[in-house]
């Protein structure tokens, strides 16, 4: 059965320190976030998260990126690892190669480690990879 999926609606990432994560995404990548209070009914019941605070949301194309505080019981020093089953990395698609240069410059200015613009060995497309403050690997990938 083929599903009529129109795209990826949202990605939610649990972050250790929402303020630190927000600063990284807003100041380094220029992604503006809005705050969604956790005490709203639909959020209170969401995934059984009893914590107070806010969810942070931004829209990238037609996809929403949501940053959520850690669930109760998450170790204070927990960080993302692609060596566990689950997500390996996430990639933003861009249509203009100049965006890759802009992202690389912004990452370097913010002292975020990156190998610069590389070429994907399978697709032959340029991309730039980096890690956020919670160690999640992100890529900006030339989609066209």
Residue positions per predicted region:
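Vicinal oxygen chelate
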Residues: 2-4, 8-16, 56-59, 78-144
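A generic structural micro-feature
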Residues: 3, 48-52, 81-84
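Core segments of cupin and vicinal oxygen chelate
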Residues: 14-64
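Generic short beta-strand segments
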Residues: 37-39, 70-72, 109
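A short, acidic/glycine-rich surface segment
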Residues: 41-45, 72-78, 116
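Short, charged/polar, Gly/Pro-enriched secondary-structure boundary elements
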Residues: 65, 75-76, 134-137
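Acetyl-CoA-dependent GNAT
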Residues: 68-75, 143-144
């Amino acid at each position: 059965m083929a599903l009529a999926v129109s795209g990826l609606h949202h990605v939610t990432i649990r972050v250790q320190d929402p303020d630190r994560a927000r600063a990284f995404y807003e100041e380094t990548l220029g992604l503006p976030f809005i705050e969604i209070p956790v005490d709203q009914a639909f959020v209170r019941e969401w995934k059984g998260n009893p914590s107070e605070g806010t969810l942070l949301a931004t829209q990238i194309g037609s996809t929403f990126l949501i940053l959520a505080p850690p669930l109760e019981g998450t170790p204070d020093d927990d960080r993302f690892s692609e060596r566990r089953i689950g997500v390996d990395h996430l990639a933003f698609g861009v249509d203009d190669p100049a965006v890759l240069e802009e992202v690389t410059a912004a990452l370097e200015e913010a002292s975020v480690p990156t190998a610069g613009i590389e070429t994907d060995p399978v697709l032959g497309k340029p991309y730039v990879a980096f890690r956020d403050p919670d160690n999640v690997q992100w890529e900006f990938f030339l989609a066209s």
